Swiss-Prot record:
GO biological process annotation, one example: isoleucine biosynthetic process
One GO MF term: 2 iron, 2 sulfur cluster binding
Gene: ilvD
Record field: catalytic activity: (2R)-2,3-dihydroxy-3-methylbutanoate = 3-methyl-2-oxobutanoate + H2O; (2R,3R)-2,3-dihydroxy-3-methylpentanoate = (S)-3-methyl-2-oxopentanoate + H2O
Family indicated by similarity: Belongs to the IlvD/Edd family.
Name of the protein described by the UniProt record: Dihydroxy-acid dehydratase
Organism of origin: Escherichia coli O127:H6 (strain E2348/69 / EPEC)
Free-text function comment from the UniProt entry: Functions in the biosynthesis of branched-chain amino acids. Catalyzes the dehydration of (2R,3R)-2,3-dihydroxy-3-methylpentanoate (2,3-dihydroxy-3-methylvalerate) into 2-oxo-3-methylpentanoate (2-oxo-3-methylvalerate) and of (2R)-2,3-dihydroxy-3-methylbutanoate (2,3-dihydroxyisovalerate) into 2-oxo-3-methylbutanoate (2-oxoisovalerate), the penultimate precursor to L-isoleucine and L-valine, respectively.
Keywords per UniProt: 2Fe-2S, Amino-acid biosynthesis, Branched-chain amino acid biosynthesis, Iron, Iron-sulfur, Lyase, Magnesium, Metal-binding
Record: residues binding Mg(2+): 81, 123-124, 491
Taxonomic placement: Bacteria, Pseudomonadati, Pseudomonadota, Gammaproteobacteria, Enterobacterales
């Protein structure tokens, strides 16, 4: 029988000092012996996805204590990728994932907490907490802050839906008037919550459902809706049950590594492909799998991407649907239900509620459930009122979207496409693979060949795009922006958005060893591995080289002979200390970022730290 970790600090005469300090936090004699559960919050006033979380930790803590546990809350950092985008701040986004994971480990292990409730929401916070949870392998439940309502405004006498990406595109489009740009900007992000499309934050919060580590509704129920409060209340109660199951009944099925098994990771990736999620999810699932010591690689993702259809299409791939529409159609469970009926899921998995996949679908899939309360929950909709307050409205859709032929979520027979929303490509400058969000690629450019325009930084590429130096037919190559080369693997949302602003969204391709925002669409290929800074062949591409992209056949090829590439590699190596570094790029890189870069691996490994460099 495992002993409560917290007993290390609460029992024994030699721990009198620790108990004295615990008493100073409000604990009493009656509390020593109860499980100490960390409430891992991420409230900050910097990030709309986290601005409403201040009081939610207390909400969870009250339920933990009512159920017989002791709750102790702490906070992690949270970077807003949208605010950090387009300048030096983006260098810090991906490294913050490791910092968050480490900080959770530090706090939980330093104070010997027995379990955790992770209150996350945005891009790197959910992955960082997920990595920490699987590293620590103590009972955990995730409950995120929830999605933002979609923005809405009236243009040309028509009400249209908006999100962050629309504001960016219109702001850079010279054909759009100042007044219209300002109107879109003021309407794009109306409430608290993670940005309203199937961007990285919402993709990851959906995937925690598929991994079994969060409750049904977690990924899609709006941040503003009163129904979301129940997820937080349930999490506080349920974590005490999970904790006691493990420590008092020796039930290892309560541990996250047994819930988020390889089968669950495969289900999560299947969901991601089917819903056209952010390419960043690939990076984060690979990283989380390594923390769980699960053999889950790019090869597994490639195999899944070849057999899973696209059953859901959401902004930025279309402006018709946002997360509020996904929820109305049954949320994550609705998509999983269709995947299960298509025979594409591993059914022998459980979630934090103790339910198997078939049991979860029977209770929560709107197509089959007989539970009116569940149907009512999925009718939770937007209010259209600007707010930063959680649970501030209780509006409901009149009906559910259960149309699997033409609705937001489709059945296998009516899939948006037989190929899924993500694909892995391989070729002579992406030997270890690269990723494209096929859900956002127009059918007319699934095969594309063009001359390379090579840039050693995102900044140079943006300047060229806005300066008219990139023309229809070009393949924009942005390199030395990988985990090591950036450092920090910047998102390329501005270059892709500006291509659209210049009318080139369907006329150019963009390839990078960096990554893309979940808000990116178009022929945008990222995560090229190995990255240039690690000696990857993307560092050998020259202006004018022809690059052929063949998404249907999963290929990407630099049309240069092997002999020429070998000669270029020899010339690169001859640069000595300057080999595999960008030419003529001035970038101030802090010590903290240099430390990150010194251990960073390429994207095909999840951009995690190279343990071999530390002898582990």
């Amino acid at each position: 029988m495992p002993k409560y970790r917290s007993a290390t600090t609460t029992h024994g005469r030699n721990m009198a000092g620790a108990r004295a300090l615990w008493r100073a936090t409000g604990m009493t004699d009656a509390d020593f012996g109860k499980p100490i559960i960390a409430v891992v919050n991420s409230f900050t006033q910097f990030v709309p996805g986290h601005v409403h979380l201040r009081d939610l930790g207390k909400l969870v803590a009250e339920q933990i204590e009512a159920a017989g546990g002791v709750a102790k809350e702490f906070n992690t950092i949270a970077v807003d990728d949208g605010i950090a985008m387009g300048h030096g701040g983006m260098l810090y986004s991906l490294p913050s994932r490791e910092l968050i994971a480490d900080s959770v480990e530090y706090m939980v292990n330093a104070h010997c907490a027995d379990a955790m409730v992770c209150i996350s929401n945005c891009d790197k916070i959910t992955p960082g907490m997920l990595m920490a949870s699987l590293r620590l392998n103590i009972p955990v439940i995730f409950v995120s802050g929830g999605p933002m309502e979609a923005g809405k405004t009236k243009l040309s006498d028509q009400i249209i839906k908006l999100d962050l990406v629309d504001a960016m595109i219109q702001g850079a489009d010279p054909k759009v008037s100042d007044s219209q740009s300002a109107q879109v900007e003021r309407s794009a992000c109306p409430t608290c919550g993670s940005c309203s499309g199937m961007f990285t934050a919402n993709s990851m919060n959906c995937l925690t459902e598929a991994l079994g580590l969060s409750q049904p509704g977690n990924g899609s129920l709006l941040a503003t809706h009163a129904d979301r409060k129940q997820l937080f209340l349930n999490a506080g109660k349920r974590i005490v049950e999970l904790t006691k199951r493990y420590y008092e009944q020796d039930d290892e099925s309560a541990l996250p590594r047994n819930i988020a098994s390889k089968a669950a990771f495969e289900n999560a990736m299947t969901l991601d492909i089917a819903m056209g999620g952010s390419t960043n999810t690939v990076l984060h699932l690979l990283a989380a799998a390594q923390e769980a010591e699960i053999d889950f690689t790019m090869s597994d993702i490639d195999k899944l991407s070849r057999k899973v259809p696209q059953l859901c299409k959401v902004a930025p791939s279309t402006q018709k649907y946002h997360m509020e529409d996904v929820h109305r159609a049954g949320g994550v469970i609705g998509i999983l239900g269709e995947l299960d009926r298509a025979g594409l899921l591993n059914r022998d998995v459980k979630n934090v509620l103790g339910l198997t996949l078939p049991q979860t679908l029977e209770q929560y899939d709107i197509i089959v459930t007989q539970d009116d309360a569940v149907k009512n929950m999925f009718r939770a909709g937007p209010a259209g009122i600007r707010t930063t307050q959680a649970f501030s409205q209780d509006c409901r859709w009149d009906t559910l979207d259960d149309d699997r032929s033409n609705g937001c979520i489709r059945s296998l027979e009516h899939a948006y496409s037989k190929d899924g929303g993500l694909a892995v490509l391989y070729g002579n400058f992406a030997e270890n693979g690269c990723i494209v969000k096929t859900a956002g690629v127009d059918d007319s450019i699934l095969k594309f060949t063009g001359p390379a325009k090579v840039y050693e930084s995102q900044d140079d590429a943006v300047e060229a795009i806005l300066g008219g130096k990139v023309v229809a037919g070009d393949v924009v190559v942005i390199r030395y922006e990988g985990p090591k080369g950036g450092p920090g693997m910047q998102e390329m949302l501005y270059p892709t958005s500006f291509l659209k602003s210049m009318g080139l969204g369907k006329a150019c391709a963009l390839i990078t060893d960096g990554r893309f925002s979940g808000g990116t669409s178009g022929l945008s290929i990222g995560h090229v591995s190995p990255e240039a800074a690690s000696g990857g062949s993307i560092g050998l591409i020259e202006d004018g080289d022809l690059i052929a992209i063949d998404i249907p056949n999963r290929g990407i090829q630099l049309q240069v002979s092997d002999a020429e590439l070998a000669a270029r590699r020899e010339a690169q190596e001859a640069r000595g200390d300057k080999a595999w570094t960008p030419k003529n790029r001035e970038r101030q890189v802090s010590f903290a970022l240099r430390a990150y870069a010194s251990l960073a691996t390429s994207a095909d490994k999840g951009a995690v730290r190279d343990k071999s460099k530390l002898g582990g």
